[in-house]
């Protein structure tokens, strides 16, 4: 049976997740579908996921963004990798860089030749064979140059360190030009269809009723639609990842910007450092069973590059994921779908991958259950692969 195409999409929640969703759907579907985003300025966004991985460039390019304009308006810096400090033992540091390592020779991967050289006493540090590592540690960056396939400068892999709030604003301006309609308000109730439990509409505190065919839940940890209305369920992964809180604070820059994010091991977790053009983003992810909020804040404040620009803010979370990212006619994107501590800078990437998957599996009004099940299987596999990196 042929079902009618989706003609109306309602996005609940703004921030990075909401506006990435609205912008991408509007870009792909255009005038074929009306898109309405509901958010409230009274509800703050988390906005600590400021580090990205190279796939974000594909997302921006697919929307047609000019990179210079994007960097300028989001106060972004370029990122060649992540430096891990004190993880093996105090004083240790290594750079997990993007891009290639060495050059393939014959049938064997490069690291096999390096291992042979190490056994012979002449291999040297593995990072010396990675362009991104060498450049990052010297504070250097350049965009890929058209120098031919044999030049390592022709395929430089990089990402961004950005202000998530400014990125959401940038996306909003783009989405609204494409016809996305923003409504200010808080959701008071969710109306479900009696016959199948699908979401029929949301009701705002003002009394306005907003109907839709497909709903995107970007409401954050509370999962306003996916959990509070549809009860999709949540898998708690605290037994694998015991960190359950983060304290975040921005500080002033005190030196040259570094083209990498830093992750430093601490007694009860780890600390991030993300350099932006106008400030440095800092946070301490920790287990509340091993350290108090005040102790965590004191530790963070004692390891800043410059003067703090705000009071430390504590965020509470339960590591895990929704049992169903897509349930009936609702898809959870961002924190409403789950949370994993951003050790590998994957928070914004998971938003991107969920949106990309949704567009690949975009339904009609029949909402084929086989399609939804396959979507959820892929989402589960992705999350499990990330925690086992």
Go through each PLM region and give its residues.
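Low-complexity, highly charged intrinsically disordered N-terminal segments
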Residues: 93-170, 174-178, 183, 218, ...
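Predominantly flavin-linked oxidoreductase catalytic cores and closely associated redox partners
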Residues: 149-296, 355
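Conserved small/polar residues in nucleotide/adenosyl-binding loops
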Residues: 387-389
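Conserved FAD/dinucleotide-binding core of flavoprotein oxidoreductases
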Residues: 266-318, 336-352, 361-368
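Dinucleotide-binding Rossmann-like beta1-alpha1 core, especially the glycine-rich loop
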Residues: 44-136
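N-terminal Rossmann-like FAD-binding beta1-loop-alpha1 element of flavoenzymes
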Residues: 7-33
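Glycine-rich FAD pyrophosphate-binding loop
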Residues: 26-48
